Amino acid sequence: LHVRSRRQRQMCIRDRPVIGWLVAGAGTLFIERGQRHAVHAMGESMQARFKLGDAVGLFPEGTTSEGFDLRPFHASLFEPARSAAIEIQPVALRFLKNGERSGFAAFVGEETLVANLWKVMGSTGLSVEVVFLPALAAKHADGTLPTRLELSHQARDAIRAVL
C-alpha cells in the first residue's frame, strides 16, 4: 500500500520565496488563518485527497510553540476524516538537543523563518523523535461516528501523554 502524505499549512508559508514553492510542490494544502470559510474549503480539499487514497497530516494546534505542552486543538480540522470514517493516526513530535527535550528549534515569537532556519541548520545535537500512537477508531463499537470534538480530545490526550 502506497500512501502519499499531504500536509496542511498556513497560507503565509505559500508566499515565502523558495520555501513556499517547495512545500506547494510537495502537495501541501494551505489554509487561510482567521477566515471562517477557509475551514470548509480545507475540508473539501482533504475529502478530495482521501478519495485519492492520500493521507493528510495536519497540525491541529494551528500555531507553533516550544513543544513542551499542547495548545488546544481545532476540532473542526478533524471533521473531514470523521465524516469519511477514516482512522486518525496521532503522531507526537519531541524535539531534542543533545538528548534532552528542548525548545531550541521552535519557530515562535518574533523570530523570522530565515533566522530560525539559520539557527537550526547551524546547530549540532538536534534531533526529532517521531512517536506514532495507536490510531483512533473511525467508528464506535455500535457503528456510530465519534464527534470531531471527541476525536480532537482523544488525539490531544494521546499526544500529551507521551510529551
Could you tell me what each predicted segment is?
Residues D157-V162:
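C-terminal alpha-helix
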Residues F50:
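Conserved ATPase "switch" residues in P-loop NTPase domains
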Residues T144-H153:
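Catalytic-core segments of nucleotide cyclases and related cyclic-nucleotide turnover enzymes
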Residues D54-P60:
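Generic beta-sheet signal
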Residues L1-R9, I13:
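Single conserved hydrophobic/aromatic residue that forms the stacking wall/gate
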Residues D15-R36, A41-G43, Q47:
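Canonical alpha-helical transmembrane segment with a positive-inside/aromatic-interface signature
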Residues P17-G25, Q35, D54, E66-T144:
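A cross-family acyltransferase "interaction/gating" segment
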